[in-house]
Amino acid sequence: LISRKLKITAIIASVFIVLMSAAYGAFYIWNKNYKFNNNYVWQPLEDVQSTLNLKDSYNVIVAGTDPEGITAALSAARNGMRVLLVEARDRNMLGGLLTEGGLNTLDLNYSPEQPQLLSSLRQPDFLNKGIFQEWFDQIEGSSFDTNTAANIFYRMVRSEPNIDLLMNVKELVPLTEQSTGDYTTITGMSITKEDGTTVQISTRSIIDATQDADIAAAAGVPYSIGRQDIGDGKSKMVSTLVFKLSGVTDEVWQKFREREGTGVDKMSAWGYGDARKYESSNPQHIKIRSLNIGRQNDDTILINTMQIFGVDPLDPISVKKGLEIGRKEAPLIVDFLKKNYDEFAGLKYAGTADELYVRESRHIYGEYRLTLADVMENRDHWDAIGYGSYDIDIQSTSVGNPGTIMLSPIQYGVPFRSLVPLKVDGLLVVGRAASFDTIPHGSARVVPLGMAEGEAAGAAVKLAYIHKESFRELSTSEERASELRKMLENQGMDLKVHRFEQPDYMEHKDYKGLLAAASMYMTSGNYNNDGWELDKGMNPERFLSKLKRMQAMFPEAYTGSADQALANMENAVTLPLTLDQAAYMLCLAMGSSETETSLEQALAHLQTQNFISADTLVGIADKNNLTNGDAFMLIRDVVEYYSGVVFD
């Protein structure tokens, strides 16, 4: 009997092993040969129809058919509000940047907690979910076919009876009336339609989902442009023109996968860092970076690599010129790729996107402005209506500037207050032009987070309607914030803050100095948050460059020049920075002349004036060899105690 049981057990074990081996073999073959095949079916673009009968008034007018605007309109409509969704650009599909701009690869906000069991077979977990997740579940993946995306957006809008859609209008002008003090209140929108006729539509609420906050600017909302808030008023992130190649079969896609140093999934590929060697025909205005490749369902790919410098997003003539030089360069870039990479050899150039990918223009000032500290410390907010985790990716601002990965956050909150602009009531701003400082905007600008903002804005219209309160009044109330968050959770958003450990840099003794330095764009941490080098030695030459950055940010406070401190110094790049030298250079930058403050007197002067704290001095281990962290702490103290600016 025992022998029989052993035989049965052995047979069962053998069968199990055979089945598992077969399953593993099948999985191996599938993973190697079929997992990355594109089995999706291409679909023609649906014809977008505008409403024929505009109403005299709506609960809310949403300006802009980028994803943020679509989400805002859907959210408001599903909450029972009558919505007019209106587009002032010449577009024939919904989706804006993702469709007309050809940006078919998403910058995603991944949750800190991801599925562990069979993770390679499961979809990643994203922050916020809600309407973004509803749309994402219907597209192909991390990249998508632009027709699919546009059609899904249109079907979602068309399915809501509370939404009227009006495309291709010639002009949108917000109508306002004077309210308290220097504040105005939205009363409606003047719309010049495609046929040239003008109508005035009444509303008490407008959601500005235009890429550049055009409605907010026209209504009188204050804003900064580009990197103006860090003392660089002429710079903004580079623009891109996405271009298309055809002939990308499953076999070609497999070759992308085999390319060393390239990452590939079913719909996206990224890498080709050495493509930067491309010699531009217009080197003052165009270069390329590594390739971001998004696959489509008709054997085409869209490539985000071209960087076009000198485009002013707020000047239509400049934008037109940017498109022209980009379209001239695109075929040349394709020729370069075909000659240098075998997998590109058989592909054909198939044109460019209809619009530029503009990363940065206006940043409005709202009831709260998202700061680098918010992102760096992964802060939550009592009125958070969405969460981000995308890298602070600051793209090039000039041909000689390669751009910066400031850091990789884990999960930070975007307050509702950042959607509520100063000076104008009845208005919300969503998307990359919301109330974000330029550095954290490098993370907060991504579309999925903008869609969370749009969903919150749409729900806020209903909340304001119920309580007969303005958006500004909502933004001051923790009770209303709790109501809004509950509404959003009830309609499918995930506003949970996940469990995670804060990054190591926050435990460093010089963290406050690091935060100040990073906020002034003096340092960066890269993708792994390990590039700060706080314990590495600082030299006089590099310290001088940090002081010049400080002076650029606060030109009225720091009118002197620290250059003279290095005038007779040899090897300023290799010599260690001493505490006396640092203090002397700080005094010179503040405007003190050599006759007033000498090298020997500078430190005592700063201490006497309480411009440097005792704790900072105690934290310096070697006063003859300052570290980066030591130097950042000195700068941080002077900026706080002399300029009155705190970055905490």
Where are the regions that the model predicts?
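Core beta-strand elements of the Rossmann-like FAD/NAD(P) dinucleotide-binding domain
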Residues: 56-58, 195-205
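Conserved beta-strand-loop-beta-strand element in the redox core of flavoprotein oxidoreductases
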Residues: 175-200
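Short hydrophobic core segments
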Residues: 200-216
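Flavin (FAD/FMN)-binding glycine-rich loop and adjacent Rossmann-like elements that form
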Residues: 11, 24-40, 50, 97, ...
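Extreme N-terminal leader/targeting segments of oxidoreductases
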Residues: 2-60, 151
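Glycine-rich Rossmann-fold phosphate-binding loop(s) that bind the pyrophosphate
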Residues: 63-67
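Terminal recognition/anchoring or ligand-binding modules at protein termini
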Residues: 521-542, 549, 553-648
